[in-house]
Design a protein with these regions (language model features):
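Short amphipathic alpha-helices within nucleic acid-binding modules
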Residues: 29-34
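A short, exposed loop/beta-hairpin motif centered on an aromatic-Gly-Thr core
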Residues: 16-28
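Short aromatic-glycine-(Arg/Gly/Cys) micro-motifs in beta-strand/loop hairpins
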Residues: 1-19
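Compositionally biased, intrinsically disordered low-complexity segments enriched
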Residues: 5, 20-22, 79, 88
C-alpha cells in the first residue's frame, strides 16, 4: 500500500499553520477520505464542525482547517523532510 504525504492548513484569524502527516492508503482518493475523517476531529472541543470545501470550520468559522495537498511519497522522503525542518544547524 503506498504512502501519502498529507498537508493540512490551519487558519485562525491571520495566523496560518501547516501540519504534515503520513497516511498509508490504496490510492489518493482513499488518502483524501482518511485525511478528511481525521480533520473532522482536528479540534477536540468543537463537537459540531461545519463541513467546507476540502475541510472543516470550527468555532463558527473562527478556525478553518483545509486539506492543502496530498501526494504520493515514501517513508524515507517524509522522514528526510521532518529531519530537515526540525534540525537546527548553526554552521
Amino acid at each position: 500500500m503506498p504512502d501519502y504525504w498529507i498537508k493540512i492548513a490551519e487558519r485562525e484569524d491571520e495566523d496560518l499553520r501547516h501540519h504534515h502527516y503520513l497516511i498509508a492508503a490504496k490510492d489518493e482518493r482513499e488518502a483524501r477520505k482518511i485525511a478528511l475523517k481525521f480533520m473532522e476531529r482536528f479540534i477536540d472541543d468543537d463537537e459540531n464542525p461545519e463541513k467546507i470545501d476540502d475541510g472543516y470550520a470550527f468555532y463558527n468559522n473562527a478556525i478553518l482547517v483545509k486539506l492543502a495537498d496530498v501526494k504520493e511519497t515514501t517513508k524515507e522522503q517524509f522522514k528526510d523532510f521532518l529531519l530537515k525542518t526540525h534540525t537546527i544547524n548553526l554552521t
